Amino acid sequence: MRDKVVIITGASSGIGKALAYELAHQGAKVVLAARNIEELLHIEQDLRQQGAEVLSVRTDVTKELACKELIEQAYARFGRIDALINNAGISMRALLEDLEPAVLRKVMDVN
């Protein structure tokens, strides 16, 4: 993965965060994307201290414009994108009959 540019959505926690650390340790240039910019910046700082090249972009994957801005910022910083890991996701626990349509729409939009 050395010098590959990888975008990871959902990078502020869980699997996305773990992927960011692993890929950075393998030499990838990592673009962190998530709604929680504070956590992204914390991860970015930690990875930079370890010698990684990192860019954090606040991104709501349910918004088309935010996704376009993510791609544009990645290209502006690194000049290319080699891989996109669509890791952002949310879940819900409810019976379908009890579910509000807006909640279902949000789950579908993110996932």
Task: Locate predicted features.
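Conserved glycine-rich Rossmann-like NAD(P)H-binding loop of the short-chain dehydrogenase/reductase
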Residues: 26-43
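A conserved hydrophobic alpha-helix of the Rossmann-fold in NAD(P)-dependent oxidoreductases
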Residues: 40, 67-74
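Conserved hydrophobic beta-strands of the Rossmann-like cofactor-binding core
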Residues: 5-8, 84-85
